[in-house]
Design a protein with these regions (language model features):
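Glycine-rich loop(s) and the adjacent beta-strand/alpha-helix scaffold that form part
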Residues: 1-41, 45
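A conserved active-site cap/scaffold subdomain adjacent to cofactor or substrate pockets
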Residues: 31, 62, 68, 76, ...
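Acidic/polar loop patches that form or flank catalytic/metal-binding clefts of enzymes
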Residues: 31-40, 65-67, 126-129
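Short coil/turn connectors at secondary-structure junctions
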Residues: 33, 53-54, 85-87
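Phosphate/diphosphate-binding loops
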Residues: 39-40, 47, 51-73
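N-terminal leader/propeptide and maturation segments of large enzyme subunits in energy/redox metabolism
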Residues: 91, 99-141
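A glycine-rich dinucleotide-binding beta-alpha-beta segment and adjacent secondary-structure elements
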Residues: 127-179
């Protein structure tokens, strides 16, 4: 995994047998087989249930949304693993967060405003606030022009405490396996 699929190797929960060291692959290569597309795999980011967290927003290290939060777990996992350098956070307000601290999604920042948690996470100055402002402006009108989140989960983020939940592949519950 480390050799052929290093991005999946970074995921916190590789699926498979710990004694599986690729012996079958190595035997095939030894007799002349070609090892093609060995980097392919499946990373899973199971952020729901509970469904109320889908009213939050998922952002990257720049404090920007990059996907609809209601995306299938595998689509979200793929986007974080392969397109966001393995880093993402779920931003929630008083109504959209988890009701308890789950081992797989630990809150890594909490505050009375979006700017407070953005500073705790080291996001570029004003970036997360701008993302939330844009999202809220459209959510109030029942629209998500960027990612078309369904109206079921679309509502403005408003009301402290605001929290950021860690979705980074190395730290969150992030199962992964190769094909």
């Amino acid at each position: 995994l480390k050799l052929y699929a290093p991005k999946l190797y970074e995921c916190s929960v590789p699926c498979g047998n710990v004694d599986d060291q690729g012996d079958g692959i190595n035997m095939g290569i030894a007799v002349g087989a070609a090892a093609l597309r060995m980097h392919e795999g499946f990373a899973i980011a199971p952020i729901y249930p509970p469904e109320n967290v889908l009213s939050g927003i998922v952002v990257n290290a720049s404090g920007q949304r990059f996907i609809s939060e209601e995306s299938y777990h595998g689509v979200l996992g793929d986007a974080i693993t392969y397109h966001q350098k393995g880093q993402a956070w779920l931003i929630t307000d008083q109504r959209s967060g988890y009701n308890f601290h789950q081992d797989n999604f630990l809150p890594v920042a909490e505050g009375s405003s979006i700017d407070v948690i953005a500073a705790q996470l080291g996001f570029p100055l004003g970036a997360l606030q701008q993302t939330v402002n844009y999202y809220n402006q459209h959510a109030i009108n029942g629209d998500d022009p960027m990612f078309r989140k369904s109206k079921t989960y679309l509502r403005p983020l408003q009301g402290a405490p605001y929290k950021a939940w860690d979705l980074t592949v190395a730290d969150a519950f992030f199962p992964a396996h190769t094909f």
